């Protein structure tokens, strides 16, 4: 068994959709990034890649490549899932935490879990998504950005 950890941070900006966990969430701002800036899927992707010692998402999907400009991060996560499988691993579980003040995402967590599970072809019961605020502290508390942390466990097939 192997453990991976992933962390991602993105800044809030105007005139962008807010996509988290593959789900569009109504909000006045979105996250800035080369792709769709899905902070949660990026953290999960990094955790999985790290568990298999395959580097990080920057190595596989560089932000200097026009191929990944505004790309749906679900496409990236599906590719990561294939890389993990090709290396001979299966995903045991994923646990993730979203850190942001607003908007509240509780109504979307089930859909996020289902989206992540579908991308990775695993049962929804293997995916945990939680959310918390930063108690108005720091850049997250000032609603300047959002962060996500993820850990995963993979095992050889």
Swiss-Prot record:
Q: Does the keyword Metal-binding apply?
A: yes
Which residues does UniProt assign to the signal peptide? none
Q: Which GO terms describe its molecular function?
A: 2-C-methyl-D-erythritol 2,4-cyclodiphosphate synthase activity; metal ion binding
Query: Where do the annotations place a divalent metal cation binding?
Result: 8, 10, 42
Binding, 4-CDP-2-C-methyl-D-erythritol 2-phosphate: 8-10, 34-35, 56-58, 132-135, 142
What processes in GO biological process is this protein linked to? isopentenyl diphosphate biosynthetic process, methylerythritol 4-phosphate pathway; terpenoid biosynthetic process
Swiss-Prot/TrEMBL site (Transition state stabilizer) positions: 34, 133
Does the UniProt entry include the keyword Iron-sulfur? no
Q: Which UniProt keywords apply?
A: Isoprene biosynthesis, Lyase, Metal-binding
Q: Which SUPFAM superfamilies match?
A: IpsF-like
**What pathway, per the record?**
Isoprenoid biosynthesis; isopentenyl diphosphate biosynthesis via DXP pathway; isopentenyl diphosphate from 1-deoxy-D-xylulose 5-phosphate: step 4/6
- Cofactors: a divalent metal cation
What does the record's cofactor remark say about binding?
A: Binds 1 divalent metal cation per subunit.
Subunit relationships? Homotrimer.
The family this protein is said to belong to: Belongs to the IspF family.
What this protein is reported to do is described as:
Involved in the biosynthesis of isopentenyl diphosphate (IPP) and dimethylallyl diphosphate (DMAPP), two major building blocks of isoprenoid compounds. Catalyzes the conversion of 4-diphosphocytidyl-2-C-methyl-D-erythritol 2-phosphate (CDP-ME2P) to 2-C-methyl-D-erythritol 2,4-cyclodiphosphate (ME-CPP) with a corresponding release of cytidine 5-monophosphate (CMP).
* PANTHER family associated with the record: 2-C-METHYL-D-ERYTHRITOL 2,4-CYCLODIPHOSPHATE SYNTHASE, CHLOROPLASTIC
What NCBIfam families does the record point to?
ispF (TIGR00151)
What name has this protein been given in UniProt?
2-C-methyl-D-erythritol 2,4-cyclodiphosphate synthase
Gene behind this protein: ispF
């Amino acid at each position: 068994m192997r453990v991976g950890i992933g962390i991602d941070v993105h800044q809030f900006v105007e005139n962008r959709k807010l996509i988290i966990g593959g789900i569009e969430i109504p909000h006045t701002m979105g996250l800035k990034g080369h792709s769709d800036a899905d902070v949660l899927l990026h953290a999960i992707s990094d955790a999985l890649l790290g568990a298999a010692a395959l580097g990080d998402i920057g190595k596989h999907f560089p932000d200097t490549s026009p191929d990944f400009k505004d790309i749906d991060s679900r496409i990236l996560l599906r590719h990561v899932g294939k890389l993990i499988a090709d290396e001979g691993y299966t995903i045991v579980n994923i646990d993730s935490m979203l850190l942001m003040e607003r908007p509240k995402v509780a109504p979307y967590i089930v859909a996020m879990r289902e989206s992540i599970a579908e991308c990775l072809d695993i049962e929804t019961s293997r995916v945990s998504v939680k959310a918390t605020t930063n108690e108005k502290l720091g850049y997250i508390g000032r609603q300047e950005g959002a962060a996500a942390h993820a850990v995963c466990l993979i095992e050889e097939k």
